[in-house]
């Protein structure tokens, strides 16, 4: 049975260097393009950090409180690679959060992501918060020994790819606020279909027509764009 980790591995074999996820933040001006190979490297480092340094275990529920972002995709794929279970509900286990809202009461560990361009560090991490950007680059580039989870999500991804009309080579524009609850649609279904994603946070609607042309967008999820095929 497929799992999210195997979907990423298939993307690496299919097109290792082409864009897998292109991220825009129109408030900060950031544009980050991540290939399948680069994504796999980030996922491996993050999985090693989570398992070896923060003691995340197979079947452990981990709260992922992150917005639409390329690093959100990395964290989710890393957790599935370990065999952990991403959840949107904070618990007494590890909590993964963005810079705002730190710390989280009752958490065993808090891993803080600044979500700044160039994997910037947290400006002033509170005591007890592990700064993702400060730790992840030192983690090993290869992850071994996990018991991948997310098989049900991967199975759903193949079905959703068909329902959304995604095909190999599609460039999917995502402009709505998305996160863990929508991960099958914006992350796993494109992986299953062999498509790639243009993920826009704080999208400036005036910039979308030019961006659609620049990124060769072929289909949109959420906000309609004139001249571009909607999903479904």
Which residue stretches match the model-derived regions?
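Conserved AMP-binding
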Residues: 65-69, 176-180
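Cytochrome P450 catalytic-core helices
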Residues: 67-77
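Conserved AMP-binding/adenylate-forming core of the ANL superfamily
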Residues: 22-56, 143-166
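Structural core segment of the AMP-binding/adenylate-forming
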Residues: 77, 81-144, 201-232
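Conserved short alpha-helical elements in the N-terminal third of ANL/AMP-binding
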Residues: 78-82, 183-197
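A short N-terminal helical cap/helix-turn-helix that marks the beginning
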Residues: 2-22
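Gly/Thr-rich phosphate-binding loop signature of adenosyl cofactor/nucleotide-binding cores
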Residues: 62
